[in-house]
Regions:
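Beta-strand/loop-rich accessory regions of lumenal/periplasmic or secreted enzymes
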Residues: 1-141
């Protein structure tokens, strides 16, 4: 699988505390291009409020993930652990995987405004005492 199309917020990376900068729509990308070129390698590529996500190969075969209530996701050729092993963003090709690492998130904490603070505003934190549920369906194309 190489190609990705989703109905959700995009086209750029967006998180709970930055999703207002991204519009709802249908967006497409090569999975490789979902990475961000940060100076320091780090977790990246989140997209929010996706109602559906489609992955296809060059022949049109693939899968569709449907989440009517919305789901957040990232699809990269790296695990977070891979990214933590490289110092600089331009070194990410050194840990590039052939497979797609797909994260489906019920909720994710906001990322704040700077690498060294301040922390996200309270409404973008995750309440530890709250219960969170989500559902999704995966089907072949």
């Amino acid at each position: 699988l190489k190609w990705l199309t989703w109905y959700g917020r995009g086209p750029q990376e967006n998180y709970r505390d930055r999703r207002n900068s991204a519009f709802m729509g249908v967006f497409s990308s090569d999975v490789y291009d979902m990475k961000e070129d940060y100076v320091r390698a780090q977790s990246m590529g989140e997209r929010t409020d996706a109602k559906w996500i489609v992955f296809k190969d060059d022949n049109g075969k693939g899968i569709k993930i449907t989440a009517p209530e919305g789901i957040d996701f990232s699809a990269l050729h790296y695990t977070d652990k891979d990214l933590w092993t490289v110092k600089y963003g331009h070194d990410t090709d050194d840990v590039l995987r052939r497979e797609i690492v797909l994260n489906l998130d019920c909720i994710q904490r906001g990322i704040g405004n700077a690498s060294c603070g301040p922390q996200p505003r309270p409404e973008y934190e995750i309440a530890s005492e709250a219960e969170y549920t989500f559902s999704f369906r995966i089907e072949p194309l």
